[in-house]
Amino acid sequence: FALKVPAKYTGRFCRLFAVYWLFTASVAYLLVAVCAAFADLHGGTLYGLMQYAPVGILPALLPFLLMGANALTGVFEGYRNCNFVKRAGQVFERSGVIRIGVVGSYGKTSVKNILKTLLSEKYSVIATPESYNAPMGIAKTVLSNECEGKQIFIAEMGARKKGDIKELCDLVKPDYAIFTGVCEQHIATFGSLENIWAEKSEILKCGAKKVVCGSSLKTWLQETDDRVLVLDEGADAQFGAMATAFTLRLYGENVPVKT
């Protein structure tokens, strides 16, 4: 058994563990006290054995105690997270950095990494690390020391429920965006492919100067404006271990590209 990401004892974990421990200790003490009171009041072997009942009852209550501790600390964590994200938005506004959002059901991390590599040849670029694609992950990247002095910020933007992309757009306010495509990823939370499209397509309404869309989105994009660019599938792309060659078609022009 191996964790994808090594466990870290973050502040949130420590706060949750402390409240969980207090809940467990309090309930255990209460159960022991009640059972002991019954034993003293009524006497007898049966009531004497009741003193040991908490030993069998408490393990069954542990999941519910954890849920209760999480609900209690969640009030504080929600307030703290909201302020953290708000502060990141303020830093965004002051920085003047060019912001690029990457949205889609698949390929976000790969596109983000490729784009960062390409742009880094000319600009100072930072991208959200690994698969950070939620408000807290983006905010953490914005408020990190590595973000200072950067010219371009690339944000991977994910969604598991309705409203997630709108929330991320309000935070990032992308100047440019890439929309890779839609598929049945997270259909368990969205319910249908149409709902997934409706959520992901919020990136088209974010006010970006240009939104580059994958070729698979042609069937979804009924009406577009000049801001939306839909890419064609490359028929002559050649991939090798040391080089890549393809023809880039933009606005009716063909540009041969080799790497």
Give the label of every model feature segment.
Residues V102, E148-Q151, L248-V255:
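A polyampholytic, Gly/Pro-enriched intrinsically disordered region
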Residues A2-L22, F38-H42:
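Transmembrane alpha-helical segments that serve as helix-helix packing and pore/cofactor-lining elements
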Residues F179-T259:
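Acidic, Mg2+-coordinating active-site environments of NTP-dependent enzymes
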Residues S105, E130, G214:
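Cofactor-binding loop segments of dinucleotide-utilizing enzymes, especially the Rossmann-like FAD-
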Residues F1, V34-G48, Y52-A60, F64, ...:
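ATP-dependent carboxylate-amine ligase catalytic core
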Residues Y20-C35:
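Canonical alpha-helical transmembrane segments of integral membrane proteins
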Residues R99-L119:
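Glycine-rich phosphate-binding P-loop
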Residues G11, R94, T117-L119, Q238-G240, ...:
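A generic structural signal for short, solvent-exposed coil/turn residues
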